[in-house]
Amino acid sequence: MMKVLVVIALLVTLISYSSSEGIDDLEADELLSLMANEQTRKECIPKHHECTSNKHGCCRGNFFKYKCQCTTVVTQDGEQTERCFCGTPPHHKAAELVVGFGKKIFG
């Protein structure tokens, strides 16, 4: 029983010490990461826009991040080119439909 109390006291001391030491660093790190996230959000590619040159730059949707979906387009000259756009994959659409339906039923 005494060992358990000593271990608990040691853990409480370590947690309080580490949290007091790192609060200022944590706040600065959080601020920098929030600023980076805002910058990333501004630069992401919206749904239905072309992502051929940046296949990992699609924005987030309601529940999931949009995926860059590519198709091969054949021109009248017979040339094949790849065209990509940001969109919601079918399995994500199904999940969003189920969640939306569940929200309507259960409030």
Swiss-Prot record:
InterPro entries: Spider_toxin_CSTX_knottin, Spider_toxin_CSTX_Knottin_CS. GO terms for cellular component: extracellular region. GO terms for molecular function: toxin activity. Disulfide bonds join C44-C59, C51-C68, C58-C86, C70-C84. Residues 1-20 form the signal peptide. It is found in: Secreted. PROSITE patterns: SPIDER_CSTX. Expressed by the venom gland. Belongs to the neurotoxin 19 (CSTX) family. 04 (U1-Lctx) subfamily. The presence of a 'disulfide through disulfide knot' structurally defines this protein as a knottin. This is U1-lycotoxin-Ls1b. It comes from Lycosa singoriensis. The lineage of its organism: Eukaryota, Metazoa, Ecdysozoa, Arthropoda, Chelicerata.
